[in-house]
């Protein structure tokens, strides 16, 4: 199922009810979970490489007019609320993988709206703070107007820091005791199709 699965919680609950009643095997298309670097970060978290997690800072900044340069960006789904657009729903992958990493969310604080001069009818900036039930705090920045684009994740723990930047596709760990960065994974030329293949393979296993 393409995300967002609905534009209202009422309809989400309806869909969930149908899925449960009909016993339909369902997967939402959040492909970033299947990115090799994101999977490596999850592995490092679970092995407690940096001890207990305290806080997280995630950023996804992009420039919407560059997404499909041969099209009018203002007419695309990402720019229109009626088509499920907006920076929060379109760039939902960050929220999804943090939920995958850390579980249920207890509190949400957010400032979200249209702040740039782009021709949009929806939100183009969201600053979000999450408190997970395990007391981990996450700061998330999403925007449609940033060049050069950035997608990064920094996770701070009691024994160090995990850092990933999509522009280099390197996952690094800072060891607090040794006061030094260590490369845990570096992909020279990442083929984005790989994560979609992994996503499909996972779904095929489920059915």
Feature locations, PLM:
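Active-site loop of classical SDR/Rossmann-like NAD(P)-dependent oxidoreductases
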Residues: 187-201
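Beta-strand-loop-alpha-helix segment that lines the small-molecule cofactor/substrate pocket
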Residues: 1-33, 48
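A short, polar/proline- and glycine-enriched secondary-structure boundary/capping micro-motif
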Residues: 149-153, 173-178, 183-184
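Short, flexible active-site-adjacent loop segments at beta-strand->alpha-helix junctions, enriched
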Residues: 5, 32, 59-64, 114, ...
């Amino acid at each position: 199922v393409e995300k967002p699965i609905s534009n209202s919680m009422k309809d989400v609950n309806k869909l969930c009810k149908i899925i449960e009643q009909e016993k339909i095997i369902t997967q939402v298309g959040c492909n970033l979970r299947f990115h090799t670097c994101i999977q490596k970060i999850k592995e490092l978290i679970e092995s407690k490489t940096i001890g207990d997690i305290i806080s997280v800072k995630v950023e996804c900044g992009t420039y919407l007019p560059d997404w499909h340069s041969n099209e009018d960006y203002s007419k695309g789904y990402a720019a229109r609320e009626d088509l499920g657009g907006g920076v929060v729903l379109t760039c939902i992958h960050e929220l999804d993988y943090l939920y995958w990493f850390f579980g249920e969310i207890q509190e949400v604080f957010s400032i979200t709206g249209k702040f740039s001069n782009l021709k949009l009818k929806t939100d183009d900036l969201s600053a979000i703070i999450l408190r997970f039930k395990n007391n981990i705090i996450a700061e998330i920045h999403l925007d449609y107007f940033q060049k050069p684009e950035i997608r990064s994740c920094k996770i701070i723990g009691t024994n160090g820091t995990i850092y990933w930047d999509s522009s280099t596709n390197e996952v690094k760990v800072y060891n607090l005791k040794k006061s030094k960065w260590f490369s845990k994974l570096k992909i020279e030329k990442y083929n984005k199709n790989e994560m979609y293949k992994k996503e499909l393979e996972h779904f095929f296993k489920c059915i």
